[in-house]
Amino acid sequence: MSVFPYGLFIAAGVGCMLIAMLLTAPKRSFSKGTVTVFGLLAIPLSLVFSRLLYCVFQLNLFCDTYENPWLMLCIWDGGYSICGVIPALLLAAWLTAKMQRCSFRSLWDCVSLSSALLFAMLYAGEGRTELGIGKVIDAGFLTSAFPFLVLEQKLGVNVEYRLIVYRLQCLACVVLFLVMLLSRRKSKAEGILALRFWSIFASMQIFWESLRDDGHMLFIFLRIGQV
C-alpha cells in the first residue's frame, strides 16, 4: 500500500490538534475522554465532508472529463477540500457534546483554538501537491529578504518569481494559534474565543486565497476557500 506524503501531513496535523486539545482543555468543562470521542468522530467526518465538498464543485471533472461519476467514490485517488474540514469539526463537536453531556461552547472553544495547528499542517503539506502557488511578483525586497517564501521559475532566459502562499498560510495559522492561546484567559464567556478565532481565520482566508494562482476549487471566478 502506498503512503502519500500529504497523508503524513494530515496525520501530523490531527495529532497536533488532539494533543493541543488535551493540553488546553478546561478541566472543569470536560474530560480527556471527551477529546478522544471527538477525535474518533472528527476524523471520518472530516474525510467525508472534505471529499463531498470537492466532488460537488468538481462535477464537470468527473462527469465530462473522466466521463465516470462513480470515480467520486474512489477516495484513495485524492481530491479533498480543506474547507470541508470546518463543518466536519463543528458537527463532531456538537455530537461529542451531546454524547458526553458537556458544554458545546466550551468544547468548541478548545476545538477552534487547536484547529489552527491542524490547518497549519494541512497548508504545509500542500507543497507536496503543487498547490498553493501565488501570482507573479516583481523582484525586490521580498524576493531577497524572504527567499523561502518565493518560488523562482526559469522560462528560458526569463525568470519569474511567485509567492509560495501555502507557506504564508501555514505561518499565519501558527501565529493565530499563539495569539489565541495567549488571549484565551481574557475570554471569560464560553464561545467568545471561538467567535474571535473564526472571524480572524475567515478574514485571513479571504486575503490569502486571493493571492493564489493554482486554479484549485474555483466556481467561475470565485475561490471556494474565500467563501
Name each model-derived stretch.
Residues 1-227:
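A feature for loop-to-transmembrane-helix boundaries and adjacent hydrophobic helices
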